Regions:
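Alpha-helical transmembrane segments of multi-pass integral membrane proteins
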Residues: 205, 231-340
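Aromatic/glycine/proline-enriched transmembrane-helix motif characteristic
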Residues: 219-237
């Protein structure tokens, strides 16, 4: 399991599913399945998978200081872009005389939660301003936990520990999903929400992390034909399950399928090397984090303008919104801009 370029292509696929969730109404009236839920699952599980791949044997300090230091190093890479999108939405609201539904108190509360990236912890605020940045609340908490996660599995015979941990985590997630999504249970109604809560999303990350530790021992050499057949079959099965069981399943089985799908992407010599491991998709995967942060603001602020300019050509509006988002992400991913943000501003 040495070449993981195709996983960047999968990362872009995850983003594209999220983009479809937010802009797909331009193309069809009914969604084929919950694109957004599946897309963010790919993001969380893939993050755990790659952290395990990169750091499973690393010497990582795991005290409180190290957790904050690691989290801070990650925060520096996206916080400025987060704040820019937040300010753009704030300006748009002020310019158009938007009346905040929760009044002044709610406005101040939600501004604070957005600036501090805590809005994922408070369910009523999860989609405020740049709605998609609830993900940043989750990933920041996960970054804080990473040093402890690495140490926990490194200090043990990790293959057996990982398998047991994976099974326990999956059963716990299945239980919580059933409680939340099927039974409507909520431990703190009005404050807690399952979908965007960072502690809940840590399960997705951990299943990706332990999934790598379990499956890395099964990545033996396969012929090109067998690898391609396995990859193609898994991708078809994944999307078929997304379509057929969209409303029947809770998220946990989809997480399991996502882990298996990611594993097939690591098989060398298969068709995914060309489909997802080409230079274009690798690059789009590299900028997917920036794409994620900017895309919904672009959709919300520009779709009406483009709709008028393009004479209600929905497909053209969809494609232009995607291109604009890519161009903006390219700018913020551009090395001089990244260095200015991380070395000059910070």
């Amino acid at each position: 399991m040495e070449k993981l370029d195709s996983l960047q292509g999968l990362r872009f696929l995850g983003f594209f599913l999220i983009f479809l969730n937010h802009a797909g109404w331009l193309l069809w009236k009914t969604k084929y399945f919950d694109f957004g839920a599946r897309g963010v699952e790919i993001f969380f599980v893939l993050s755990g998978f790659l952290v395990a791949y990169n750091y499973r044997d690393a010497d990582f300090a795991y005290d409180l200081k190290s957790s904050f230091k690691y989290m801070w190093s990650k925060l520096q890479k996206f916080y400025v872009l987060h704040m820019l999108t937040f300010l753009v939405v704030l300006y748009h609201m002020e310019r158009h005389g938007f009346k905040y539904p929760d009044g002044v108190h709610g406005f101040i509360r939600d501004v604070f939660l957005n600036i501090t990236l805590l809005k994922g912890w408070y369910d009523p605020a999860k989609f405020t301003f740049n709605g998609v940045t609830w993900f940043l609340s989750c990933i920041l908490f996960i970054y804080f936990c990473v040093p402890h996660i690495i140490d926990f599995f490194k200090s043990k015979k990790w293959r057996g520990t990982a398998l047991l941990s994976f099974l326990i985590l999956f059963m716990l997630k299945m239980t919580f999903d059933t409680m939340g999504y099927k039974m409507g249970m909520n431990p703190w109604s009005g404050v807690f929400g399952w979908y965007c809560n960072p502690a809940y999303r840590l399960f997705d990350f951990l299943l990706g992390y332990t999934g790598f530790l379990v499956l890395s021992g099964f990545s033996g050499e396969l012929s090109k034909k067998k690898a391609s057949l396995l990859q193609g079959s898994m991708l078809i099965f994944y999307f078929a399950a997304c379509r057929l069981f969209d409303t029947q399943w809770v998220p946990a089985p989809f997480i399991l399928l996502t882990v298996l799908l990611i594993f097939t992407f690591t098989l060398s010599g298969g068709i995914f090397d060309k489909l997802f491991g080409n230079k274009l998709l690798i690059h789009l995967g590299n900028i997917s984090f920036e794409l994620y942060i900017v895309h919904q603001v672009n959709i919300n602020l520009m779709n009406h303008i483009l709709d008028e300019l393009l004479d209600h050509n929905n497909l053209a509006v969809f494609l232009i919104l995607l291109v604009i988002s890519i161009l903006m992400a390219e700018f913020f991913y551009w090395k001089p801009v990244k260095e200015f943000i991380t070395k000059t501003i910070w």
